Amino acid sequence: MSSLKNWDNKTWLSSLKYIQKFNNFLLNQKKLNQNSIILDIGCGRGKIIGSLYKKIKFKKKPIGIDIESHKDIDKNMIFKKQNAVSFLNQTKKNFDLILIKQTIHLLEINEIIRLLNICKKKLTISGKIFIFSLDPYKNEIPTFKLMKRKINNSLKRDKKIFKLIKKLDFSLIEKKFSYKVNISKIKYTDMIKKKYISTLLNFTDKQIFTGIKEINTRYNKKLIFNDKLICLILSK
């Protein structure tokens, strides 16, 4: 599979309003202070943990790891272009919060189990793992037909992943996060062109072009919908 480069590249996911709401959600679920140590697995450009650093004023910058590097990475984090398992096996740090946002579905089942078991060993006593993924039951993402079919197949797999995680040896709480998106159709089709979501990564240029034509026909000039996520909060 191609790497996911544009999920936080000038999208609502990288907007100040989204990041503020997301970080407020995190802080309502997990108390953090200046001494907290943070890790973001699949951090993208690191805007979320970079904003969290400025808000809390951590003594140590959060660490973000991703297999894709960008020129516009947030300066308020330490970025490592590395596989998550490799990093966790090498580091001597323990973390108060490990964030895995809309990344877990990209892994094979055995990789998920291995990753979470290592993450557990790297938690502080009160540390927590936050796993975010699209809500498979109430998804409102605007789509064209082929995209919809691919997303539905992906969400079916997500349900299986959730069931698997719930069987692992963790204390687990399930929460929901929702953000109301208000975006122009022109901006959204540009995001589709840039393949902002993993579902689109293997689509051909022709499939993307046809899909955009379908979006232009089906939807109004302004798209308003809820971006809904399931959040699994794991602790020892």
Question: What is each stretch, according to the model?
Answer:
Residues 1-33, 47, 51, 130-156:
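Conserved class I S-adenosyl-L-methionine
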Residues 39, 44-87:
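Class I SAM-dependent methyltransferase SAM/SAH-binding core
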Residues 99:
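A conserved beta-strand element that flanks and buttresses the S-adenosyl-L-methionine
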Residues 102-103:
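Short catalytic micro-motifs in class I SAM-dependent methyltransferases
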Residues 113-125:
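A short glycine-rich, Lys/Arg-flanked "PGG" loop and its adjoining helix->strand segment in the class I
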Residues 154-169:
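Short alpha-helix
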Residues 173-236:
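Conserved Class I S-adenosyl-L-methionine
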